[in-house]
Amino acid sequence: MLTEPGTQPSPFGLTLVGAVIQGSFNLANRRVAHPVRLHGCIFSDSITIEGARFDGDLHLRQSRLLAQNGHPFALLAEAVEVAGSLRLDNIFVHRGALLLGYSEISGQLALNDAAIWGSSDEGVAVDLQGSRVQDGFFMRKTTLVGGALRIQEAHFSRAADFSGSWINSRGDATAAIIGDGLKVDGHLVASDLRSEHGPVDLTGVECSRQVRLDRMIVNGPEDQAFSVALDRARVGGDLDLTGIRGMGSVTAESCRVEGKALFNSIALAHGSISVSGGRFAGTLEAQKVSLPKGHLDASYAHVGPTLAIGGDLHQNLAGDSVDARHIDVIGRVVLSSLKSSGAVQFGRAKIGALLQAEDLHLGKGGAGGPSMDMEQASIVGGAYFGASCNLTGPLRARNASIGALMQFSPWTRFGAGPNGVAIECSGLRLQGDFAARHIVCEGGLVADGARLDGDFDLQGATIGLVGSESRQGIRIEGAAIEGSILLAACRVIWGALRLTATRVGGQISGDSETIIKAADNSDLSILLNRCVVGGGIFFSGLRAEGGTSDLGHAEVMGPMHLEGGHYGRLLLDGCVAGGDVLLNEVRCLEGLSLRAMRVEGSIVLRDAKIWSRNENDDAVSADRCHVQGDLDLSGLRTAGERVSLRESVVVGSVAFVSVTTVWRSPAKESLDPAWRNFGTGDGIALGMVDFRHGSAKTLIFDSELAAPGGAPYAIDLTGVSTQDVFGFLMRDWNSAINFIRSTQQPNGALEVSETFARLFTSGGRPEQARRLLEVSEARRRGRSLWAVVLRVTTGFGHYPFRAALLTVLLLALMSGVAFVGRSHFVPTNVITSAVDAGAADPVLVAGQTPIVSSERCSDSYPCFNAFFYAVDATVPAIGGRQAEYWRIDDTTTGQRLQLIFGVARAVVLGLAAIVAGGVAGLLKRG
């Protein structure tokens, strides 16, 4: 009756409630015009409706399919066409599978609250492969025991919802849900789904709206490859995988998600999370994940506003817990509450905003590699390491580019790598500050070739640990830092501060809490080699222990403040300082060297204490220095061979006030520090200050200076050039006489002698005063002719002498110019014939050739002379006759000659003024 040809559809159709149907129910390849509603019926055998066409609904709700005939299916409905809905809610299948493959259902397919205990030969409990459902497929809270759900290549136009279902696929199926190639025009939801023996395979799924697989539980064997697979998926909305629990991995490789992708709170016993190569238009979150034996792979992914990662992770074979190499994030990256046994890889990553890390605890990478690797990464918005960051291994930012600052919160900790480096940022391009205050590095910090637009701030940082394998300290080679290097309260332990070929736009500063302790096998504490410092060096009170501090060959545009510092050996050889060099109260255990320094300001060694352990070395060596200001050695105390200032030039004053040079006595050798009770007690002998062949405007010394036993002078001033001397009576008056005899003083020698004479007279020694005046008078009588010439030419400054010499040279040059260009000089009165030669006013007749020129003379007209013309034209005051009889023609070359002679005339006038001033000064002096 249902399938009789010509039967008209009935709005009521066939409705059976609670019927028991013994035998087969077969409507295969039939057309059913009426709705069929079989509610609560019991079917002893299988239902076969394969190829049938239903013009209305087909309902089997609350029915029981027993399949006692032994067929592998309980419902065979492949290639069925249903114009209405197919509702299988609350059915119970005792044996066999539901085969609905390649069916066309215009309405809704509902399989809610069903229990299916059977499966096909392929291990499938519900088969919808290739089916098309117009109004959605709903399988909520359904139990599949023994088989899988296969929805391969199916197309659901409204939605697909498997929420709360329980699938125990114990058969031969490869997955609990086989959904590769599935297409859903609406939502795909599998919230709270539980799978006991197989994964969920949704590879290549296409969903126009969101996909929700949250709180899914996927159990399986330990060797299960994956729990959920969404590789190559296309999701038009959000992808929500929050709270998945499973054994294997969760993969979404090469997928495309137009909304947010949420991988939060995923716990995988043996698996990992992989989104490699995926494209996520929205936020990608993987926070509070638990991967005790897995890692997170986000390499080559493209992420929208935010990438957020956090949780407990293990590592892969390469030692990486988070692999984000080549990732492209439009917005920011947040690493929050991340604990891993491996490293975080951001090599060659592109981050459009900020990289932010907080509560970070990372292990080392493979082979002891870095805990965080940002090599060649590009970060537009800066990098920030917040509170509670602890990296067991080093941080690598080699050749990275960061568009803003790089900031570390206090007490951020970094371990050392195999090379002893804790932070490696060689080649870093940073457009802001490197702010690393109070960080703790178990190894060194290396920034070779870095480019920083801001400050390099290490205030309060601890670099290196005592006894660690690191010997690096702070190393910056070939870098350019536009800001300053700030080392206040910085502690460099078991290393050194090395700056080589580095340009610093600001200052390099430390303070009394800055400590640089060299390693036991190193002889270097500080090295500034070939550095350019724009703002000065301020190391007031800095302590450099255990090695040499070499600041030589550095070019410092500003001052150098090293006062109160403690050093081993301090070297400033070849250094150029744009301001003052302050070494007040400095302490040096192994000597101070200032050789060949160039200082625009003054050098102040006031109250400094310099110790030299090698008695053959100078305590202070400042030979060949050039100081534009003063050299103040007041209160200097040294222990060594001597203070050497040979051939130094001091434009200002040199003060030898209360200078004490001593050698160690045997009783002093056991004292530590070496200058305890410095300069007092028995066994201390005075040394000598060597200032031979030096130059200073003024010398200042006092009565504390005395020559030691066996030394001719307390201060050796042989060949010194000076203009004035101030001081008190010296203990040994012979030293004063020898000083006068050995000092070359082109000006003021008599005044110096008179100064000493007044000092000796006031001290009750008139005989010594008389002898000083005799020495001075003998020197004045013995001046040579060369001394007179020097006095005349340079006594009132070098400029008059040079001006006169330049005037003569300029006249000689202009003579040569006039001789070479003589063809362009014509007579002022043109002579046309011998008859007219004697005329008072000769006139040129048209067509006639002049008989007088600069190259041809006449008895009746003065000849042209190049030298006298040059003198007459450039020095008008002489009043010669050449300029009256000869002039330059109006040709192009002639106009150039006129310009040259005009310029020469102006120059000669200026030089003449300088010469006149010098002559006037000489006459006034005489």
Regions found by a protein language model. Give the residues of each.
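Juxtamembrane "helix exit" motif at the C-terminal ends of alpha-helical transmembrane segments
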Residues: 810-833, 917-924
